[in-house]
Amino acid sequence: MKKKFLVLKILLIVSYFNTYSQSYLNIDWDSDKTILFPSDNDLYGIFNNHYVEYFKSKFTEEVYVYETRHTKTKINRINNPLDNEIIISKINVSEIVDVRAKIINQDTIISYSFDEMKKMINSDDSDENYNNYKLPNLDEGDIVEIMYTVKKDFNFNGNKIIEESYPILLSKFILIENNFKSNIKIYNSNNSFVSDIIFDGKKSKQIIFNNLNATANEQYS
């Protein structure tokens, strides 16, 4: 049986853009008290949020897409070298504009800026398609919060797979519309709906997903 992934498909219908600053600049670290739930998985997602913004340059007619991912994850066990790495795809990406990380444990909170993250690129595992950042000194029980943003060329259509290889308590998808219309379709989810919100002072659409299961590596037949 073919594995069904939870997928969003986005269609831009009418394009008319404001010239506000990019919203990724105003996404802050999570300030809520972290509520943990028992899990047998090596990793447990507290949240995994996606932001997509279509942005018109202030100085030219060019339009870009800024995609931000903001995650907070509990490390229960480190059984895989990938558990302490951040892998960012560069496929169809013109620029990685920001990468930040925060490591939280019982005693300390350590934050890494974009300049510090650049020094953590693992050149052996990075190539023209992916950047691999290796976070230092991670221990079991740590909570890792990550934010990164990539810049892409404009495209009328887009899609996003929401699930990960570990369970996620909460996931949000926010499409920052500004002054254009969009059409979002949700596939393989029966309890999630699109709602209109104002995000960073801009007209946006939001979808909330609760208690996402981990994806599995399955054979196709």
Named regions from a protein language model:
Residues 22-151, 157-172, 207:
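Lumenal/extracellular ectodomains and adaptor appendage modules
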Residues 7, 101, 214-216:
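A sequence-composition feature that detects small, non-aromatic residues
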Residues 1-25:
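Bacterial Sec-dependent N-terminal signal peptides
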Residues 23-34, 151-155, 159-165, 172-221:
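Secretory-pathway-linked proteins and extracytosolic
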Residues 15-17, 125-128, 202:
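Homeobox/homeodomain signature
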